[in-house]
Amino acid sequence: MLELAHKLADSDTKFFGGWVLAGVEAHIHGQANQLENRVLLEKERKCIIQVRGTTLVAGAEQLVKELRVFLVLPKNKLGTKTIEPGAPTGKLLVEHTFTVQEVRDYVAYTGDENIIHQGEHPIVPGLCMAAWLQQALQKQELDWRISFLTPVYTGDELKIYATEQELAAYVGSTKVFLIKL
């Protein structure tokens, strides 16, 4: 996941000036020898960027990793939208509190220099949380469709709950992202 996020940072720098990750589709089924990215859709306030990872199998190029990110440029200041709290459901799998240093390390590795991930109380990058979760769950292969609902800031205690068909992340009683399995 981290190598896909690193390649994503090769995208046009205009997408790092306050754009927000609204959703991700991630498929990982092996090691890639080559990564490439391209913009699939670009509009005034939304875009879709794809990162593809391929390898040669019996002389033919085979897709083994793919990341599609849906970015939006919000009209309102982040954190101003009211989210209805709800009780988490499912089994608690893991929990983690991201630090400013973890975000800095992620930004340094991937090159994701979006202004929202900087400062003394930055927003934790969505792909940073996804990569942490992939590692925490020890997933070598995955097919995830992630919807990011509200920002997670450093210092927030993130808890991941599992049901049969999804993983839900909460900060307190607020659902912050959802992963369809």
Predicted features by range, described:
Residues 1-30, 72-143:
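Hot-dog-fold acyl-thioester-processing enzymes
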Residues 136-159:
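A conserved acidic, glycine/proline-rich C-terminal tail/linker
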Residues 2-3, 14-15, 19-94, 152-154, ...:
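HotDog/MaoC-like acyl-thioester-processing domains
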